Amino acid sequence: MKNIIRSAKHLNFIRKQPCIITGEKGEACHIRILSDGGTSIKPSDFYCISLHTDLHRQQHYLGEISFYQKWSINPFTIAKNLVTMSSCKKVNTQTIIHLLDERAKTYGRIYQNIEGDTQSPST
């Protein structure tokens, strides 16, 4: 079984942050792609960003990659920044930051490949 990290303190910090898109009141939104979660298992609480309720629903409806593409967001970069701002010292935050940085790079490569696939061929 994967080592899922739970942190009520970090989630409370995320819930106090404004939505990363609208700046309005946000709620904790877990990032499932490229994470340590699984089917019906939320990923670690450090794989989390703040989204307005309506946008959080939209993220689930569209699917994560489509949602993040629509808004030109790399969620792992944002999650990494939130971890550095959080006062949660339950775990080695440097390890979490390193993992999120690696996921951000991987997501960037995936995003570039998707963008390349959607461009029309040159004539």
Describe each region flagged by the PLM.
Residues 1-25, 43, 49, 53, ...:
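Extended charged
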Residues 25-39:
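Short recognition patches in nucleic-acid-associated and regulatory proteins
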